[in-house]
Swiss-Prot record:
The chain crosses the membrane at residues 8-28, 51-71, 102-122, 128-148, 188-208, 239-259, 266-286. It comes from Papio hamadryas (Hamadryas baboon). Most taste cells may be activated by a limited number of bitter compounds; individual taste cells can discriminate among bitter stimuli. GO terms for cellular component: plasma membrane. This is Taste receptor type 2 member 42. Residues 1-7, 72-101, 149-187, 260-265 are extracellular. The keyword Manganese does not apply. It is found in: Membrane. Belongs to the G-protein coupled receptor T2R family. Its main location: membrane. Keywords: G-protein coupled receptor, Glycoprotein, Membrane, Receptor, Sensory transduction, Taste, Transducer, Transmembrane, Transmembrane helix. GO terms for molecular function: bitter taste receptor activity; G protein-coupled receptor activity.
Amino acid sequence: MATELDKIFLTLAIVEFIIGMLGNVFIGLANCSEGIKNQKVFSVDFILTCLAISTIGHLLVILFDSHVAGLAPHLYATDRVVRPVTVLWHMTNHLTTWLATCLSIFYFFKIAHFPHSLFLWLRWRMNRVIAILLTLSLFLLIFDCLVLEMFIDISLNIIDKSNLTLYLDESKTPYDKLFLLKTLLSLNSFIPFSLCLTSLLFLFLSLVRHTRNLKLSSLGSRDSSTEAHRRAMKMVMSFLFLFIVHFFSLQVANWTFCILGNNKYTQFVMLALHAFPSCHSFILILGNSKLRQTAVRLLWHLRNYTKRPNPLPL
């Protein structure tokens, strides 16, 4: 039977799910309708749509996982539930993270200005660079799935033992393997994080250089390019902040689950972990002028609809 803490956990998980679905469904529908109307799909719209779809899938897996954790935690000890849920969670999380990373790199190439020949060469082949990164992410996903299979097998073997402390004292080999596999899974997250951090640093350098050139030419320090730099930096910084919270929450959740099992601490750490897919879509909407204008029009129509008087009954 669900306790009060379980009910609070499930309520917060459902709230996160609804918030995330509202933002990502809006992004997907807005970009699809725009593409159908214009008969053309731009690179940024394609990345945003794929990101919205992968995040929706991730949110659905999270919702199912939260209900299992809150209502039937004993199922985590069975291979029938823990393996498909864990693999699906990692797959959708991997795709969401890498698509968000590619979006940050796209904004960097689109907005930053450097005279260096390597930057100009990469910028000219921006779509190809994004395609190569997505292909690399798929190879890393295959590697992740193989490591994850071994991680799940060892975890289930440890859970099957009646006395975990005695088992670890008798043989350190399973624990050492678990630590090694968890480290490998964690290291893969550093690649998209490093790419986003590099994009942010170069965007900042480009902004400083652009502002200095404007001051030297006596044109002031604010123009359309400066504002574009700042908007892009805010988006990448927001993504990095959410990604840091997401990454450290994942590490804490992994350790608490491996050491303490599926307890109340693990459940509430997972809520912080799920803030990334829930909130990131609204950062994207606020940072994209087209999506922001569409959202404002939608809210205006909803406001007028709610204020419209009801017809008198016959």
